[in-house]
Regions:
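The feature marks the mature, well-folded catalytic cores of soluble enzymes
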Residues: 1-287
């Protein structure tokens, strides 16, 4: 059996930067509290916990005011930043620079009187944070079909952003659907490309690899949006696809009769997790 790795996969710049910043802080100043999971990958969260980075799920859990608090790569809204400052906490801001750009565009558009439409999951940490910068003028829309649920009395000036982990073609279809369904109510439309190039590159690489193999294994946390999107991209190519968090989830029957297997990993998936999956596939192929 031939095992092929996607040419672009695993930790993106933003995640790698956030993990390194938290590890460095824990090493230099002692224990650190992360406000929410560092990334949507349980292996990374556990590894950081062992190195002194614990997780508080909300502001209410920040009982110890003596420990530094880390904002995760997903970012937060200005209300959270203000509350951390009010409490006098030392803050380590690991927000991905690409997410910061999205936040600043959300604020700018809202300040200029636009309603801000965000193509993204309203429950995703990044999207919740970006919405916080719109001063109540933002709307998260998870699918193009949900555009019909937008309020009828929206301002005639609309700004459109995307969750950074979405695919470019999906964002393009979303914008097209918005134009088709609301053009008569729009006097001005401003679309800002807030997609992450690293995520897009990984999706392109996954799609290319999916066309060359009989089976795709996508490695990453179940809660990771970009990993789920990778699996969707592979499935769109018609190839048998499985999303696993670890090598322990691999099933021998998946590989029966397969000669070419592809492996990719999401932007929050560490190299060691991908390596373990590849090694386990080799073991299953040899058995």
């Amino acid at each position: 059996m031939e095992i092929l790795r996607a040419r672009d996969m695993g930790f993106c710049f933003g995640v790698r930067r956030a993990v390194e910043m938290m590890e460095q802080s824990a090493q230099e100043v002692g224990p650190v509290i992360s406000l929410g999971s560092i990334v949507h990958n349980p292996q990374v969260v556990e590894r950081l916990r062992q190195r002194g980075v614990d997780v508080a799920r909300s502001l209410d859990e920040l009982a110890d005011a003596s420990l530094p608090v880390a904002i995760t790569a997903h970012g937060v809204g200005p209300d959270v930043v203000a509350e951390l400052e009010r409490r006098g906490l030392d803050v380590i801001d690991t927000t991905c620079p690409i997410v910061v750009r999205s936040q600043m565009w959300a604020k700018r558009l809202a300040d200029e009187g636009y309603a801000v439409i965000i193509f993204g999951d309203p429950n995703h940490k990044e999207v919740r944070g970006v919405l916080g910068w719109t001063k109540g003028r933002g709307y998260a829309v998870p699918r193009e079909e949900d555009l019909e649920h937008l309020p009828e009395d929206l301002p005639h000036k609309l700004g459109v952003l995307s969750q950074t982990t979405h695919h470019a073609s999906h964002f393009a279809r979303f914008v097209q659907r918005l134009i088709e369904t609301r053009l008569d109510r729009i006097s001005e439309l401003r679309v800002v490309n807030t997609l992450c190039n690293a995520t897009t590159n990984q999706q392109v690489a996954a799609r290319e690899l999916a066309q060359e193999v009989e089976l795709m294994i996508v490695v990453g946390g179940r809660e990771s949006a970009n990993t789920r999107h990778l699996a969707e991209v592979c499935q769109e190519e018609g190839v048998e696809t499985y999303h696993v968090e670890s090598a322990a989830e691999l099933r021998p029957e998946w590989f029966t009769g397969k000669e070419r297997v592809g492996v990719t990993g999401g932007a929050s998936t560490p190299d060691f997790a991908i390596d373990q999956v590849v090694e386990r596939i080799r073991e299953l192929a040899a058995s």
